[in-house]
Structure formats: structure tokens, C-alpha cells
Amino acid sequence: MSEWTWDESLYAGSAAHYPVGRMAYPEALGVGLRDELGLDGQGRLLDVGCGPGSLTLLLAPYFATVVGVDADADMLAVAAGRASDAGIGNAEWHQSRAEELPGELGAFQIVTFAQSFHWMDQPLVAARIRGMLAPGGRWVQVRATTHRGLDGPDELPRPRPPWDAIDALVARYLGPVRRAGQGVRLNGALPDEEEIMKAAGYEGPDRLIVGGDEIEDRTVEQLIASVFSLSSSAPHLFGTRLPDFEAELRELLTSTADHGRFAERRREIETVIWH
């Protein structure tokens, strides 16, 4: 099978579901990065593959200007709306693929990638971002899983979401191979990101671990949004069968919830910092 290539339908229809279905980054992540990086409310942040601004807006108080870049126009519209609702006035949004940078955006003290670098041409993007970092600037990659929590036998205040059954339902509609845009994305060996970064001239990395084990209360609606926030089960993939899938998903969740609610134990968040 040919190698997967990006196309603009990757997250088609997912933007509105993302901030509802994904667990928000905790305030501790922003505080931890503030302390680790010495952020003081000055300078510029570039958030690459920003989606609906989940990390961009969390870090906005620690910079004079934050710039979110994403290839998906709908994601940027949601991000701009969230910034407006939160009264955040120092955020800018630009539609662009990471591979198209720098795009006359200028230099940045910090460049972040939150759950996004794996979608990109990593050697190309690493090299281009290197030229966008101001002297002393740093690259920060946030590794997290926010659509679902940890599996485990430990008891929680409410039942865990039936993720195995959810995955099986998605596979029944879309097939067993993970969908991604107009193609499929096969599981395989991941690129050695440390080798890529060092080849591009970066030094490091330093690591910061934040959170983990917190209990998150989640509703049926949040779980439905979580499924639709994923590229592998984005709404457009279901075509005319979308209403049928959503009805089955809702029935599955309603029948296993405790009065419409679930509990999940959050995963830790790792940040990898290069300079």
C-alpha cells in the first residue's frame, strides 16, 4: 500500500467537536512551562498545528503575542471564537501547513507542537522552524492523549467509557484499518524524532512531566464529541451513515453510563524541549 499523504479532509467536520470532546490541558501545564522556560509575558509564541487553540490559549497570558497556525480553516475559526469568548486579545491565527512555513511570520522565542508533529514532514518542518527561532529560542513538543483516559482495573466514582466497544463500533462502520483523510494510516515503526531534531541542529532534549492520575468526569455528549474529534472517526468518513453511527454510539454510551456520566483517569503529559 502506498505511503499515506496529508489531505485537507483529515479533520473535516471535527473542529466543533474538539474542544468539547478532548480533555483540556491542565493549568499546571501552563504554569510548568512558564517556570521551565522563564516566561514573563513578553516575546512571541508560535503554536504549529494549533487546532482549536487548546495550547495556544492556555499559554497566551505568558506572551505578548501568540500565533496559532493550522491547515484546517474550521479549526482556526473555532480557535478565534474561543479566544474572543475568553477575552484573549493577543492571539493571531493563520491558515498554513507547517511545511509552508515560515510564511513571513517572523521570529519566535518559543515554538510549540501539541499532538501535531507526527502528521508532518518532520525533517522539513524541524529545519524550517530552526530558522524561525529567535536567539535562545526553544522548541516545545507536547505529547499527550486527551480524547481518552487510562485503562485499568482500579475503581472510579463512575464507570469508565466502553472504549473497546466504541472502537469496535467505529471499525464496523469504517473497517479495521485506521482511516486518515482520504487514505488509511497503517501502524508501523515511528521515526526517530531525536535523530531528526539533532540532524536539524537542535540540542537537548529536556523533559517536563505534568499531571497524571486526576479523575475526570465525562458526559455522554463529551464522549460522542471525543469520537468525532479523531481523524480516524471524523464525521465526513461516515458519509450518509453518519446519523446511524451516531445513534448507535449514543445508545451504547447511554446504556453503560451512570445517569449519563462516566469517569476517566487522566494520563500524564510529557513536554520535550529542544534548543
Regions found by a protein language model. Give the residues of each.
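A short, conserved alpha-helix within the catalytic core of class I
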Residues: M120-I129
